[in-house]
Amino acid sequence: VNDLHDIRDRFPGVTGEWARFDGPAGTQVVDAAIDAGAAWQRSGNNANSHGSFAAAVACDALVETVSTTMGELLGAGPGGMVFGPSTTSNMMALTRAIGRGLGPGDEIVCTTLDHDSNVSPWLLLARDTGATVRMAELDPTTGRLPVDAVTDLIGPATRWVAVTGSSNAVGTIPDTAAVTAAAHAVGARVVVDGVHLTPHHVVDVAAIGCDVFTTSSYKWYGPHAGVMWVEPDLLDSMDVYKVRPAPDSGPGRLQYGTPSWEALAGIDAAARFLLETGMDRIVAHEALRFARLLDGLHGIDGVRVVGPQDTVDRAPTLMFEVDGLPPVAVAERLATDRVAVWDGHNYAVEAMLPLGLDAEAGAVRAGISVYTTDDDVDRLLDALRDVAASG
């Protein structure tokens, strides 16, 4: 069935006390990921890699297993999987290495739709190297990123293009394959921030064609960690910053220190949960809840949905405002009814002003997750009607 009614039972942290719409910042953890992390810590295998004894061999096997699973989830193959504490830290490591080959006259294309983890690292790189960052502008009416807004900035001087797979603010999904093709036509490389795309969409890195794809397992029911796929030949050719004993090839070049083995076990379990449940089923389930939410918001006087007004080509995430109330006040009022939403810019710093929002106050954000039910949606809408009526 597409409805996935029983899927909620897989999440010990989802008790029904709260209606949870805070998933875009981090979801609750699926039982298999909780169990896998705990089992690893109880196993006696909490050692290190590249040793001759059983626990060390188990660490190596875990890396191979989770890399294979992630390759299947992302459609990328097992090679080039870099594991780190977060996507932000992975991006800082990546851009620091990239910067060793850039200088004045080189250009990087970023977008105003992106999370700041795919903007600030490039701005810092440009500051340090003399390269130039060019910003592709989102459409302020639709909240979408037109392909030509990016491709018009790509030229002979372009070295890297950084683009989101899906907006973490309003959910819109750019055509990353078209952007990648345009970048590759001039010899540029492409980083796709897939953090918000991965939990809500079938990912196919091979079809996108990008050179780097980032994601974070805590956005898709796993532990707090970041996963970054780097095209293996590119990874081996980069002049990375690393300690001397670190390997000269493979993902270990960009992994700083010993990974969290329990996190790797949890990542593998969470990714398997997505694969076994089926991303097509998850997408269909979330789409029904998202349509219910969007339709309901359109029917509440004094509530304005930010950006796109339909569900086409987007992840099930939206932002809204309530007349006469700052976003933080709306979030606080909803919390008294045990409805969890976020307020602010949500790290989509560059998107706020084009969307007509205050740069800091932003708007209220609500996102659908696999465990969201119709009852959750109705709780949010009922509570919001009261807030809007008394605002």
How would you label these PLM feature ranges?
Residues 1-391:
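Pyridoxal 5′-phosphate
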